[in-house]
């Protein structure tokens, strides 16, 4: 049938003057970011200007047992990455960080996001002699930067020049022989923050990664900002700041980020509770208990309960060893994982009118299965409330929903969806309310709901064309 959307990637970097286990700290930080990608991961370490690394398919704990982590050795800088494939197939070659050697040195790069002009850039680079080894748009970014590096005095100048050419969503952590650099696209589609650890600096997709290694949160990287950590301290280039309206993906607050993270000044946990409160105002119902679908539906359920006065109940036990269904790359894998992911607590549900809170309905498969579990546990009624508007359009900025064909809301009305998933009523959060989730009240990308994107998007399935590379011309 239909299922849920998934996360993209998580990035991390650390700069230390020495005496710090940068590989071990990166390992710990990637554990904290594991929710952002579960297909592959990698760590690259810089030891006195020599960059080496390891990456593979699997979870952080699987790819880096103690002996593998020890082989990475010591160093002063490191970058790490957890990946879910949004552009480029699932393969070891597409795992990150990418390590690039060029005439002026070397570079390791980790990327969260998705380019909208990757196909055009790749074609131009290949015509100029570039040889690609992956089907990931991250390699396009890396080669664009190295191309600019040939005619600029520094790596940060090369990055700034590359930003004039690459379009779309990108939060980057780049490691050169002497510097660690954080980059956020001018729209700020994906989060990126700065932390302080002793006399060193760290960059991460979410603040929870800083907490996991004992680093102090300093601030978020501004949209369009380039932040450089080196022996001189921390400095930034703001040439591209303020060029575009801020457009953080609103799904970072709804689903992607961990609830204990703070993104652009707003706590994710609080934002999700606000979503639940708005839902209670927009879609009230007579019921006996409010239950959240683990994990991202739990905070919204608390908000709905507080606003409505309907008691909150724990209705599910989650198998913590099962990966998030939204992050499973294949539909068959999603369905299998749902079957063993959740179990109901029947004493909370039996004979009661249940308000079931979930973060989204994209394809519908996961939701339908969860509703079936609640029915089988003896619910008298099931009323679904969703802490996001209907998902009506593809995402071009880092989630794996590139076609309207797979979106249940595109081909069915809300009453029809309610019938398909088996609920007595169904209510979605309004687009107006979803833009008010964050306390900071800043701008969001809501293109997946409204069809209005902050930047020009490809008219065709550029992702598929990109992954085929030059084969169309052969």
Regions found by a protein language model. Give the residues of each.
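Flexible loop/turn segments at secondary-structure boundaries
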Residues: 86-87, 117, 189-190, 210-211, ...
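Extended, hydrophobic alpha-helical segments in both membrane/secreted and soluble proteins
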Residues: 290, 297-304, 308, 312, ...
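A conserved beta-strand->alpha-helix junction
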Residues: 134, 139-142, 312-323, 420-438
């Amino acid at each position: 049938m239909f299922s849920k959307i998934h996360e993209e990637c998580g990035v991390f970097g650390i700069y230390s003057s020495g005496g710090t286990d940068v590989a071990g700290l990166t390992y710990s930080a990637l554990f904290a970011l594991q929710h952002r990608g579960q297909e592959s991961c990698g760590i690259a370490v810089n030891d006195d200007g020599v960059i080496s690394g390891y990456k593979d398919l699997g979870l952080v704990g699987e790819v880096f047992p103690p002996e593998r982590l020890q082989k990475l050795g010591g160093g002063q800088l490191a970058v790490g990455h957890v990946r879910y494939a949004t552009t480029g197939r699932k393969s070891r070659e597409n795992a990150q960080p990418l390590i690039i050697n060029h005439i002026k040195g070397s570079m390791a790069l980790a990327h969260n996001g998705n380019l909208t002009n990757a196909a055009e850039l790749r074609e131009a680079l290949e015509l100029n002699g570039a040889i690609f080894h992956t089907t990931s748009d991250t390699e396009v970014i890396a080669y664009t930067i190295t191309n600019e590096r040939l005619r600029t005095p520094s790596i940060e100048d090369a990055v700034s020049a590359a930003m004039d050419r690459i379009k779309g969503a990108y939060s980057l952590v780049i490691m050169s022989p002497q510097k660690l650099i954080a980059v956020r696209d001018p729209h700020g589609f994906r989060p990126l923050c700065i932390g302080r650890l002793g006399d060193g600096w760290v960059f991460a997709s979410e603040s929870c990664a800083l907490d996991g290694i004992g680093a102090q949160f300093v601030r978020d990287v501004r949209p369009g900002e380039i932040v450089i950590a080196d022996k001189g301290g921390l400095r930034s280039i703001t040439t591209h700041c303020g060029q575009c309206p801020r457009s953080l993906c609103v799904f970072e607050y709804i689903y992607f980020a961990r609830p204990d993270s703070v993104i652009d000044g707003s706590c994710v946990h609080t934002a999700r509770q606000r979503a639940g409160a708005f839902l209670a105002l927009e879609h009230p119902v007579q019921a006996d208990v409010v239950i959240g679908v683990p994990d991202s539906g739990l905070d919204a359920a608390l908000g709905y309960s507080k606003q409505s006065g309907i008691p909150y109940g724990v209705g599910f036990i989650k198998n913590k060893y099962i990966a998030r269904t939204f992050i499973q790359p294949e539909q068959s894998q999603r369905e299998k994982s749902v079957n063993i992911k959740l179990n109901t607590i029947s004493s909370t549900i039996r004979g009661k009118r249940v308000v079931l809170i979930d973060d989204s309905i994209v394809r519908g498969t996961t939701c339908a299965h969860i509703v079936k579990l609640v029915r089988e546990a003896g619910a008298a009624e099931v009323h679904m409330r969703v802490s996001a508007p209907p998902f009506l359009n593809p995402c071009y900025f880092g989630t794996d929903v590139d076609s309207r064909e797979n979106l249940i809301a595109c081909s069915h009305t809300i009453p029809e969806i309610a019938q398909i998933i088996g609920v007595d009523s169904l209510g979605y959060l309004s687009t107006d309310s979803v833009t008010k989730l964050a306390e900071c009240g800043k701008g969001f990308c809501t293109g997946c709901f409204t069809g209005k994107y902050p930047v020009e998007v490809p008219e065709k399935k550029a992702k598929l064309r990109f992954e085929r590379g030059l084969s169309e011309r052969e």
